[in-house]
Design a protein with these regions (language model features):
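Catalytic nucleophile serine of serine hydrolases
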Residues: 68
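Patatin-like phospholipase
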Residues: 1-63, 76-280
Length: 280
């Protein structure tokens, strides 16, 4: 795998002035990458081993914010033993086996079991109280009821694609972003959309919802979040759709030359994330 490093102007200025070392990274973003996350898991392992993902001299934690499978990677990095958690996640994901045409109910049940296996309850407490890393999980809430059956989901998804293609604001007619994090009042920036607490009681549902690809999963309800049906966080935040912090340096490992805001935008070559988002 070939790695290409790119830096925005503010990030580059800081790198030249201070270098890159422990306490210099303010956030790591885990975008929605589909199965490609398996390759990025090895990079996550290396970042953890390097010591880059540690709090700065003022005690400000590194933000780990992810959507879809990126949220699962970030959750593994928030555990007390990230290498072991990443290994469990990779192994459990690869072992998944389905009939040629599984129902959304079957897929949802399987991944609910997977996430509870990878992140058992005793681990959840540390994930939410980690003194070095602050976990944030992005999910998308459907505006109105979201069907459980594939045909109804795909119909609504196609409508959302059409309205988003006409104008980026059209996405809000179908989906609303929600960020779940422990102690929301300590998150450095107020993201657009809703913010809800991430707790041991809703952690597994939040992670399941963040990876619930429309058409393949049933919608998920999340206790403590605004009432509604939740699904894949990559719908609203595919690569990077909003600032996650006001400090450099933000690491955004992803798989292509473009940075798209929403899942729909990845299919629109003229629609890229704001250049300002990439400055840090």
């Amino acid at each position: 795998m070939t790695l290409l490093y790119r830096a925005g102007s503010r990030a580059l200025a800081r790198l030249r002035a201070e270098g890159l070392g422990p306490g210099k990274v303010s956030a790591l973003v885990g975008p929605a990458t589909g199965p490609r996350w398996l390759a990025f898991a090895r990079l996550d392992w290396a970042l953890h081993q390097s010591g880059l993902l540690t709090a700065d001299e003022e005690g400000r934690r590194v933000l780990l914010v992810g959507a879809s499978a990126g949220a699962w990677r970030m959750a593994a990095l928030a555990t007390a033993e990230p290498e072991a958690a990443l290994d469990r996640l990779c192994a459990a994901y690869i072992r998944q086996s389905f009939d040629p045409d599984p129902s959304p109910a079957e897929v949802t049940r399987a991944y609910r079991r997977l996430l509870r296996e990878v992140f058992p309850n005793p681990i959840a407490g540390h994930m939410l109280t980690n003194l070095e890393r602050h976990l944030g999980v992005i999910v998308s809430r459907a505006v109105g009821a979201w069907p459980k059956h594939r045909s109804g989901q795909l119909l609504l998804f196609a409508r959302a694609f059409a309205t988003n293609a006409l104008h980026p604001s059209g996405l809000a007619r179908s989906f609303r972003r929600t960020l779940l994090c422990a102690h929301p009042g300590t998150w450095p920036l107020s993201p657009s959309g809703d913010v809800a607490p991430l707790t041991p009681e809703n952690l597994h549902d939040a992670l399941l919802a963040s990876g619930s690809v429309p058409g393949y999963f049933e919608p998920v309800r999340i206790a403590g979040a605004p009432a509604g049906d939740y699904l894949d966080g990559g719908v609203t935040d595919y690569h990077l759709a909003q600032p996650v912090t006001d400090r450099p340096i933000v690491l955004l490992p992803h798989h292509g030359p473009r940075v798209a805001a929403s899942w729909f935008d990845k299919h629109l070559p003229w629609r890229n994330s704001s250049a300002e988002l990439l400055e840090d």
